Amino acid sequence: MLRYERQTLRRFDGVLAVSDADRETLAHLYPDAIRQPVHVVPTGVDTAYFSPVPRDQQPVTRNRQPVPSLIFTGSMDWLPNEDAMLYFCREILPFIRSEEPLARLTIVGRAPTPAVKKLADAGGIVVTGRVDDVRPYMREASVYVVPLRIGGGTRLKIFEAMAMGKAVVSTTIGAEGLPVTNGTHVMVADDPASFARAVVVLIRDADRRQQLEVAARALVVEKYDWSAVAGELEIALARFAGRRAGEINPCKSPSLVLDT
């Protein structure tokens, strides 16, 4: 695979990566195969589509506290997601329920494996399977959890949750490659007890939860809305085209490869 990627990269005038971490990996693995520095064009999100419910439209609860609701979204036939939910339900959720016995978990995503479906047998866990629209489920949640232990791919799910103004608790691997600050945009915890403690804090402290929600939404709107991402892509294309114009064969169109 390394040989194939090296040969492929040599064919292109420019390379795009979706994160700084990916750019650093490419530069480390293939310093002799890339013609110029890798340009980062981050994964984008439609912040108009993934938007929070305005506070003046949120339901009012009288004489009762809302039931703590946690959510995870993703394709549930993908090993990292399956592993994350099995790990969360077996090792983290018991800690949470020792403090918040009524806490519920909703697992939203297509093709749940038999092992994931079986999690619902324990009670207080809903496995939806494929849904047409994840937003109603996300809007009802108090905290969005990302207990990933296996890396790979991009973390678009976190940007979608942040765009919707959700407080996110993630492992380091879950937030890998994302320019978020622990304690400002998300809460990061890597062992079961610490992860559970972060979730419980956000369940109980509405002000702290709101601080995270507001900061997360602001970051995504500023830097990861599709309009901002399109600007980065335009810069990359202009740079690659300008470099190509100074070479021997200016008639040939610049070629790009995107590493995800």
What residues fall within each predicted segment?
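Acidic donor-binding loop of glycosyltransferase active sites
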Residues: D13, G124, R139-G153, M164-A167
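A short, well-ordered alpha-helix in the C-terminal region of glycosyltransferases
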Residues: R208-E222, V229-E232
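Nucleotide-activated donor-binding/catalytic signature segment of Leloir-type glycosyltransferases, i.e.
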Residues: E100-P136
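Conserved acidic donor-binding segment of nucleotide-sugar-dependent glycosyltransferases
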Residues: V186-A193, V201-A206
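Carbohydrate-associated surface elements
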Residues: A21, V41-G44
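Acidic anion/phosphate-binding donor-loop and adjacent secondary structure
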Residues: A27, V45-P59, K117
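Conserved donor-binding/catalytic core segment of Leloir-type glycosyltransferases
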Residues: R62-C89, L93
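Short hydrophobic beta-strand element within catalytic cores of glycosyltransferases
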Residues: K157-E160, A167-T171
